[in-house]
Amino acid sequence: MVTNLQKELIAIETIKVLYQQIKELRETVNPKRLGKYSDTFFDSLSEDWFDGINLSSWMRGLNTSLGQSFFENVAHILCNGTKKEFTAKKKSLLQLSQSQKLRIANIITDLSNGNFYPDSLADNDEISEALEALEEATGFTADVFFEDDDHVVCIELKTVKPNKGVFKVEKQKILEAKEALRRSYPKKKVKFFIGFPFDPLSIEPTGFDKQRFMKYSVGFDKYFAESEFLLAAELWDYLSGTKQTMETILEIINSIATVDFIENFDFLQQKENATDKKSEYINLLSKWFLLREIILVENRESIRSKTSSNKRIVRVFNQDVFIIKREDDKYKVEYNEERNAILSSFV
């Protein structure tokens, strides 16, 4: 199951994205003119709020970089993974034989000409036969990378409407990456997926149809088998190892992304509310899944009594829950993890 700490970390990512997007849009444009974005996301800027939001609406309401960052961070939280680069810049290029590169290129040609079907197992069996002197493999970055005792898993997160022609390039890159990873992790099974956060064609927020989705993206079924990509709920369940993870993510988003989001955020930033309006403060923290912060509020008097003679700790106690910065006309919001860690040691 998704743990309480994971829920809190996902909630923090949601808060960061919402605050940044809303503050910037309020300063630059009239929300009612944003027809190209989803109503459900941007109604949080107006008086009308649509009860219930899905990841399709959430993603369309974010700019590309902000949305990509959100999904990557949530993925890392769920699987305890990281983003990992195997690139020349990072001096972490893997190795591959020239014959393997040639065989992969031939497979791509056969796929392009319709002479070969995208069966990942057949691809891997054929390529792995090649053994000879090694050279540097093509660099790549895994948006999600995690390793356990038996497996190495890489996932590349994509937008749900990739550009035409991208799948040929992606297939070749993934085939090369899998073979190079096998050489680096010879005792482990290597898996490499493309991941799509949601199915834009599904009526249900967490629903998906892989065959329909493959037809929706031009050229997808020419290069990839169903087993080579993870879609919507399938992706999130795979990352967490538990069912109904996508429902949990949506529950968190819906609890936070309301019409009074900015007012709620400001309420939590006002430290005196933790004392003067303690019950209301704790209720909002609970609604926003900020469970570690609840522990601090409930133990506020005890912490103060233990630290009253320590000016440094008193100053930490008086810091904001969230740190707000503005860099290059962009808002950056971070949960004050250092404050929480220091104060939690006195609970």
Stretch-by-stretch model annotation:
Residues 150, 187-191:
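Short glycine-/polar-rich loops that comprise or flank the Walker A/P-loop
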Residues 74, 100, 158, 166-168, ...:
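A short acidic (Asp/Glu
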Residues 79, 142-161:
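Conserved catalytic cores of phosphodiester-cleaving nucleases, focusing on short active-site segments
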Residues 1-93, 275-347:
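Nuclease-adjacent, charged terminal/linker segments that flank catalytic cores
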Residues 190-282, 291, 295-302, 319-346:
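Domain-level recognition of nuclease-like catalytic cores that cleave nucleotide substrates
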Residues 59-61, 128-132, 159-165:
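Surface-exposed cleft-lining segments at the edges of enzyme active sites
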Residues 91-149:
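Active-site metal-binding core of divalent-cation-utilizing nuclease and nuclease-like domains
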Residues 159-184:
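Mg2+/Mn2+-dependent nuclease catalytic core
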